[in-house]
Amino acid sequence: MHYPEPITKLMDSFMKLPGIGPKSAARLAFYVLDMKEDDVLDFAKALVDAKRNLSFCSVCGHITDKDPCYICSDTSRDRSVLCVVQESKDVIAMEKMRDFHGLYHVLHGTISPMDGIGPEDINIPDLLKRLQDDTIEEVILATNPNVEGEATAMYISRLLRPSGIKVTRIAHGLPVGGDLEYADEVTLSKAMEGRREV
C-alpha cells in the first residue's frame, strides 16, 4: 500500500517502538491524524519534554526528573536493604506493592553473553561502589526469572559472597489466583523452592 510521505514517516517512527509492527503503526498514524491539532501538539510536547527532562538518578539509576531521585532522597527509607532490579519499570512495580521500604539499584539490563552484554555493560560497577558504604546489610536480587535474569543474579551473588553482606533472591512461583494445572514446570519448581514455613 502506498501512503503519502508524512504518513509513512509517522508509521516508521511508531515502528521504532517495541511491539509495534506495520499494522499497528498504520492504526496509530491514522488515529493521530484524527486527533485535534492541540492534542497532537500536546502529545508531541510530552514526548520531547520526557526525553529532555528525565535522566537517571546518580545514586540508584532510577529514572527521575531531579537528582537524586525521590526514593534516594527519602530519609525515612531503610538504608540497610538494597533491592537490585533490571529496569526502572521494576522499581515502579515494587513501589506499587507498598511493602518494600528499602532502597533500589537499577542495573539497566542483564548479563547476556549471546547478545554481547557483560557485567561491565550494565550498572554492576556502580553497585559495587555503592556497597562500599557500610550501611547496607542485605542485597535483594529481584531480576526476572529468565535465563539472563538468573545469570545476572548468580553473578552478583558470587561477587558479593566475600563481602559478608547478606544476599537474598526473591521467590518465584505461582501468581495469586493461579491454578496449578496451568503452571509450567519451572514455575512449579520455583514455587516449591521458595516455600516457607507457616
From Swiss-Prot:
C4-type zinc finger locations on the chain: 57-72
Record flagged with keyword Cell inner membrane: no
An annotated GO BP: DNA repair
Protein name: Recombination protein RecR
Residues covered by the Toprim domain: 80-175
Protein keywords: DNA damage, DNA recombination, DNA repair, Metal-binding, Zinc, Zinc-finger
Coiled-coil stretches noted in the UniProt entry, renumbered to this chain: none
Purpose: May play a role in DNA repair. It seems to be involved in an RecBC-independent recombinational process of DNA repair. It may act with RecF and RecO.
A Pfam family matched in the record: RecR_ZnF
Species of origin: Listeria innocua serovar 6a (strain ATCC BAA-680 / CLIP 11262)
Family label: Belongs to the RecR family.
Gene from which the chain derives: recR
Example GO molecular function: DNA binding
